[in-house]
């Protein structure tokens, strides 16, 4: 069996007047993430990791922020399409390990919900999706609550 590893990263600025979506679920928060799509940094990092593992470039290549059809798109659609893209190359998702870096809102209570959504979209077991949350202890742009970042590592396998 052939396996490959990918790494992804994304960051978006926090602004007023936008909804906050993380891991495919909506959070009630006074700020949301600015972006061409719904700006779900966790899903974007996972997409980049999957595409990188399959040597298929990155999310901006497949879903450019200059394309009108992706304006305000639900990132869950992007993840489902990314899984289809790697499947067309003969790969399936093995597992995901991801971290969201944000001071607020506190994410711990909703991590299981994110795991369920992500597992469903990637057609894998929920036990194969790890989502963690951390802060930067008030340091940097994340600590000043100017933005949220996410990191993801994935393993993909040649489909049999």
UniProtKB/Swiss-Prot annotation:
The record marks 36, 135 as: Transition state stabilizer. Its cofactor is a divalent metal cation. Pathway: Isoprenoid biosynthesis; isopentenyl diphosphate biosynthesis via DXP pathway; isopentenyl diphosphate from 1-deoxy-D-xylulose 5-phosphate: step 4/6. Gene3D superfamilies: 2-C-methyl-D-erythritol 2,4-cyclodiphosphate synthase. The keyword Lipoprotein does not apply. Belongs to the IspF family. This is 2-C-methyl-D-erythritol 2,4-cyclodiphosphate synthase. It comes from Phocaeicola vulgatus (strain ATCC 8482 / DSM 1447 / JCM 5826 / CCUG 4940 / NBRC 14291 / NCTC 11154) (Bacteroides vulgatus). The gene is ispF.
């Amino acid at each position: 069996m052939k396996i490959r590893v990918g790494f992804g990263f994304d960051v978006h600025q926090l602004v007023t007047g936008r909804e906050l979506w993380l891991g495919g679920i909506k959070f009630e928060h006074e700020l949301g993430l600015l972006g061409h799509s719904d700006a779900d940094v966790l899903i974007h990092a996972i997409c980049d990791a999957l595409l990188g593992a399959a040597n298929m470039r990155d999310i901006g290549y497949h879903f450019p922020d200059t394309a009108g059809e992706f304006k305000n798109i639900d990132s869950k659609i992007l993840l489902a399409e990314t899984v289809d893209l790697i499947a067309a190359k003969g790969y399936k998702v093995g597992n995901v390990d991801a971290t969201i870096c944000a001071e607020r809102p506190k994410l711990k209570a909703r991590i299981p919900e994110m795991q369920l959504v992500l597992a469903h979209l990637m057609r894998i077991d929920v036990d194969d999706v790890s989502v963690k949350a951390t802060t930067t202890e008030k340091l940097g742009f994340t600590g000043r609550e100017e933005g949220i970042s996410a990191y993801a590592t994935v393993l993909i396998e040649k489909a049999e």
